[in-house]
Amino acid sequence: MLKIERLLINFKTLEEFKRFKEYGMQELSMLEDLQDNIIENDSTSPFYGIYFGDKLVARMSLYQVNGGTNPYFDQRQDFLELWKLEVLPGYQNNGYGKALVDFAKSFRMPIRTNSRMKSADFWDKMNFEPVKYDMARDKGENPYIWHPDMDGEMTSGETA
């Protein structure tokens, strides 16, 4: 079983994020996000990752969003924004991305994400649904959503 860790906001994590920037697309870069929030060992980090040995090989950011401004789910409820999921080349197709998504699902809250870089098939496999595009709301993004009721694989209280 893979262990998902909340990433500390510190200079070590900053160095690890630089590895992702070498491989990833600019839109997936979290380096600037981390630099803007750097407080040594901040425990309220929105960043989560998976290590293989001592090397960070997969990561995402996960934010809780106030449902009062929620245009994606029927009951204006709080939801999670799953952002910038990325797995380093050489570690892809080993279940790391799925493990991060399952971790986010374990909070049993609706989730919104943005499909990038030909990742629609991945989100479909994770039981996310594409949202009908609305130019004013989505502003060039390709939102996908998941609600706990959409996924029969996990039961209430079960964690990934």
Swiss-Prot record:
Molecular function GO labels: acyltransferase activity, transferring groups other than amino-acyl groups
Domain annotation N-acetyltransferase: ranges: 7-151
Organism domain of life: Bacteria
Broad EC category: transferase
Keyword Nucleotide-binding (UniProt): no
CDD domains cross-referenced by the UniProt entry: NAT_SF (cd04301)
NCBIfam families linked: PRK13688.1
Protein name per its UniProtKB record: Uncharacterized N-acetyltransferase RBAM_014960
Lineage start: Bacteria, Bacillati, Bacillota, Bacilli, Bacillales
